[in-house]
Curated annotation (Swiss-Prot):
GO-annotated biological processes: coenzyme A metabolic process; ecdysis, chitin-based cuticle; embryonic heart tube development; germ cell attraction; germ cell migration; gonad development; isoprenoid biosynthetic process; locomotory behavior
Main subcellular localisation: endoplasmic reticulum
Protein name: 3-hydroxy-3-methylglutaryl-coenzyme A reductase
Gene behind this protein: Hmgcr
Free-text function comment from the UniProt entry: Synthesis of mevalonate for the production of non-sterol isoprenoids, which are essential for growth differentiation. Provides spatial information during embryogenesis to guide migrating primordial germ cells (the pole cells) from the ectoderm to the mesoderm. Also required for association of the pole cells with the gonadal mesoderm.
Protein source organism: Drosophila melanogaster (Fruit fly)
Length: 920
């Protein structure tokens, strides 16, 4: 019941973050603006009236009271009570003689408290820093700052204390702030993938942490509050500060902190890649420990706390109520306001700004100690702690393993057998060495004892349950059941059993945990393929958002292959500067393209998208040639074409039929639909529209037989003259003029040499080879590199690499170079397919073309096509210059085989070039 209340409270704070934060700030502002003068005046008036009444009563009762109406000492309830309960309370009033209590013992005690608070706060922040998440560390720092602000406000206004007393009060707040709980809640919140999941995670965290924290707060308040009953003014002040620290920390943690977590996620989801933060949060030890089993309170400890709470409440009730009817209380109520007013009016104000500054800047002994501690901690963090401990551990792992091996006395044969048995256990032990140990050091003795330690920590490994029992758990909808309740070995046994319960190709959706599904699939494939153990270890699979891969990019996933991504640029295109991402494993490609960008950007590249249209060409058959000709004529009729276009356009918001080319081959028709597809590459969009158009044509010609939705007249992912002639995708043309000075300084050549090489190589040589669309040097290199980086279909480089590179001598003296690149079939898009993957999406963002254009659909895809064509021009120019200068082999040797020094000047022909990537 209590847990559900905290869960509801957490949902409210997380779903209404602005309201909670504004309400808390409003309350704080009200505390800051409270006018205590009215309260003081009322209290003074009451005290004066009461004193007058007492004086009148005293004079009327006889001479025993004195003519002045002074109350005798006997009426104050005895010396014992007076000494214990003074009428001046140090936390709310200015008391004479209070400064005298700042003796040597007090200075020593407060110095110890301050140093302890600083060290404890430093320890907590270092613990959070080791998690590797700057977001959690920043949120914890925000929590500390806001708590300090509210605590300071309460000290100054709510308790009426002096500003100078903050030097003692703030250290008590640092002592009670527990950043471990705030770190747990922050990581649990940041593990959510959307706002609704974050809200539920915060509510779940408060449900688990709230009851225990609330009980601890009550116990701490009652326990520390006993000090306020001591009658020792200095102790009462310190205990009151501590009590208020506990309360402020609890209020901020239960209200401001969950609202702040929810708000930070909501504001940062468009500007911060939260997947990195979520992966760090999911992989941390804190989040792994935040489970129901770990957070279940110890019943014995809970009972002890309840007993302590009851006893402490009894102490407080007795101490505060027992003397409520005594004479002391009457006198205290009578005299306290008057004495407080007199002291306040007669004492020298120590809270003036100048006095406070002088007092705080005075370097006493305790100030020197605190300063030394702070400086030492800062130096320690900067010079020693702010390093990644993993390299130190890796450097020590070799000597440690050797020392452990040397310390063994097991015979070699037995050791070999045990090594095979404990392969899996040793892997787990190595993992635990990096996650459990706080120190990065180890020795031989600790290494040899790790296996028993593992069994003590993890517990005995349970054998897999029967398959039928595992199936019942897998299909159960009860809480605590489902795939999460099964071990990896049990999932493997279910897959091996066959059936439709957990097929290997759908294991991610069955487990509802894609990364775990990929891990188990790797185990199964490794076993079925009889691979050596660890063969797939170098193929990464962790820390990847597979939800964006499933049903979009790849099936039967085993992991991912990292490809280096470089950039070429700056590239000045149509007045804008771009840094073009290129993913490749071919050395010198990015460097060569970058050199071309440097030459082109002197005067800039101009581009134009001449035509747009994705194609799909179904193949249909008719009973006779005459019937096929009749159908061709019917489709080409303008009125009938509009009917077909209406059916085609009804399948998509962006797909619009633009043209229809029909080729007849006997009784077969090849109908090539051409459509614009917005910012998508559009093959699936056109296929869907073509299918709907064929259905409409079939209504007019029932004897038409659909042979294939794609009849290779499109033509997709194959060299084809029709794409070279009629185009497919985006038809882009770029041009640029390179000055003679740029040719000499950047490319080390001249215009006439480049023009002659282009004529003989790209035109004559391509014609001799019968190349289709190959009138270029190496356009496919740049096209494929940009395609891989931006999430395009890599296989479409076959069609997209069609390029005609032309060069002419320019200007009056013919020393400048005029260059154009025409690419009639660039198939690119900025939405769909691989463009949604995190890395590829980042590269599109780098170019400013991620996703669909907000106002003009299709503009982002056009801009990407223009960038690709301009990048191809840069690569073409640089390679042509390298060819005429004999720099090609030299550059490839330098970038691909740096250990081989090639001296082309002294020995230009005696070089082995078989290891070069590609020489066009």
């Amino acid at each position: 019941m209590i847990g559900r209340l905290f869960r509801a409270h957490g949902e409210f704070c997380a779903s209404h973050p602005w309201e909670v934060i504004v309400a808390l700030l409003t309350i704080t502002a009200c505390m800051l603006t409270v006018d205590k003068n009215n309260t003081l005046d009322a209290s003074s008036g009451l005290g004066t009236a009461t004193a007058s009444a007492a004086a009148a009563g005293g004079s009327g009762s006889g001479a025993g009271s004195g003519a002045s109406g002074t109350i005798p000492p006997s009426s104050m309830g005895g010396s014992a009570t007076s000494s214990r309960h003074r009428p001046c309370h140090g936390w709310s009033q200015s008391c004479d003689g209070l400064e005298a209590e700042y003796n040597a013992a007090d200075v020593i005690l407060m110095t110890i408290v301050r140093c302890t608070a600083v060290l404890y706060c430093y320890y907590q922040f270092c613990s959070l820093h080791r998690l590797g998440s700057k977001y959690v560390l920043g949120i914890a720092g925000l929590f500390t700052v806001f708590s300090s602000f509210i605590f300071t406000t309460a000290i100054i206004k709510f308790l009426g204390s002096d500003i100078s007393e903050l030097k003692d009060a703030l250290f008590f707040l640092l002592l009670v702030i527990d950043l471990s709980n705030s770190g747990r809640l922050a990581q649990l919140a940041l593990s959510g993938s959307n706002q609704a999941e974050v809200t539920q995670n915060i509510a779940r965290g408060l449900e688990l942490l709230g009851p225990a924290i609330s009980l601890d707060t009550i116990v701490e308040v009652l326990l520390v509050g006993v000090g306020t009953l001591s009658g020792v003014q200095r102790l009462e002040v310190l205990c009151m500060f501590a009590v208020l620290s506990v309360l402020v920390n609890y209020v901020v943690f239960m209200t401001f902190y969950p609202a702040c977590l929810s708000l930070i996620f909501d504001l940062s989801r468009s500007g911060v890649d939260m997947s990195v933060v979520r992966e760090k949060a999911k992989g941390s030890l804190l989040l792994k420990s935040l489970t129901e089993e770990e957070q279940k309170a110890n019943p014995v400890l809970q009972r002890v706390k309840l007993i302590m709470t009851t006893g402490l409440m009894a102490v407080h009730i007795y101490s505060r109520v027992a003397f409520s009817g005594s004479d002391y209380d009457a006198v205290d109520k009578t005299l306290t306001p008057t004495l407080s007013l007199n002291v306040s009016n007669n004492r020298t104000e120590s809270g003036e700004i100048a006095d406070i500054i002088i007092k705080w800047l005075t370097m006493s002994a305790d100030h020197i100690v605190i300063s030394i501690v702070l400086i030492a901690l800062v130096v320690k963090f900067i010079c020693f702690d702010n390093r990644d401990p993993l390299p130190d551990q890796l450097r020590q792992s070799g000597p440690v393993a050797i020392a452990a091996k040397a310390s063994q006395t097991t015979p070699i044969d037995e050791e070999h057998v045990e090594q095979e048995k404990d392969t899996e256990n040793s892997a787990a032990v190595r993992t635990l060495l990096f996650t459990i140990e706080d120190q990065s050091s180890a020795n031989a003795s600790t290494q040899t004892d790790l296996l028993p330690l593992r069994h003590r920590l993890v517990g005995p490994i349970k054998p897999p349950r029967p398959v039928q029992e595992c199936l019942d758990i897998l299909n159960s909808t009860e809480e605590g059941s489902g795939p999460a309740a099964l071990s990896d070995e049990e999932i493997v046994s279910i897959v091996h059993a066959g059936g439709t319960h957990c097929p290997l190709h759908k294991i991610e959706s069955v487990l509802d945990d894609p990364e775990r599904g990929v891990r188990i699939r790797r185990q199964i494939i490794g076993s079925r393929a009889k691979m050596p153990v660890g063969r797939l270890d170098v193929l990464p699979y962790e820390h990847f958002d597979y939800r964006k891969v499933l049903n979009a990019c790849c099936e039967n996933v085993l992991g991912y292959v990292p490809i280096p991504v470089g950039y070429a640029g700056p590239l000045l295109l149509d007045g804008e500067t771009y840094y073009v991402p290129m993913a490749t494993t071919e050395g010198a490609l990015v460097a060569s393209t970058n050199r071309g960008c440097k030459a082109l950007s002197v005067r800039g590249v101009r581009s134009v998208v001449e035509d747009v249209g994705m194609t799909r060409a179904p193949c249909v058959r008719f009973p006779s040639v005459a019937r096929a000709a009749e159908a061709k004529s019917w489709i080409e009729n303008d009125e009938n074409y509009r009917v077909v276009k209406t059916e085609f356009d009804s399948t998509s918001r962006f797909g619009r039929l633009k043209d229809c080319h029909i080729a007849m081959d006997g009784p077969q028709l090849y109908i090539r639909f051409v459509a614009i597809t917005g910012d998508a590459m559009g093959m699936n969009m056109v296929s869907k529209g073509a299918e709907m158009a064929l259905r409409r044509i079939q209504l007019q010609f029932p004897d038409m037989q659909i042979i294939s939705l794609s009849g290779n007249f499109c033509c997709d992912k194959k060299p084809a003259a029709i794409n070279w002639i009629k185009g497919r995708g985006k038809r882009v043309v770029t041009e640029c003029t390179i000055s003679a000075a740029t040719l000499r300084s950047v490319l080390k050549t001249d215009a006439k040499t480049l023009v002659e090489c282009n004529k003989l190589k790209n035109m004559g040589g391509s014609a001799m080879a019968g190349s289709i669309g190959g009138n270029n040097a190496h356009a496919a290199n740049m096209v494929t590199a940009v395609f891989l980086a931006t999430g395009q279909d890599p296989a479409q480089n076959v069609t997209s690499s069609n390029c005609s590179t032309a060069m002419e001598c320019w200007a009056e003296n013919s020393e400048d170079l005029y260059m154009t690149c025409t690419m009639p079939s660039l198939e690119v898009g900025t939405v769909g397919g691989g463009t949604g993957l995190p890395g590829q999406s980042a590269c599109l963002e780098m170019l400013g073309v991620r996703g669909a254009h907000a106002t003009r659909p299709g503009d982002n895809a056009k801009k990407l096509a223009q960038i690709v064509c301009a990048t191809v021009m840069a690569g073409e120019l640089s390679l042509m210059a390298a060819l005429v200068n004999s720099d090609l082999v030299k550059s490839h040797m330098r970038h691909n085989r740096s250990s081989i020094a090639v001296n082309s000047a002294n020995n230009p022909l005696n070089v082995t070039v078989s290891s070069c990537s590609t020489i066009s």
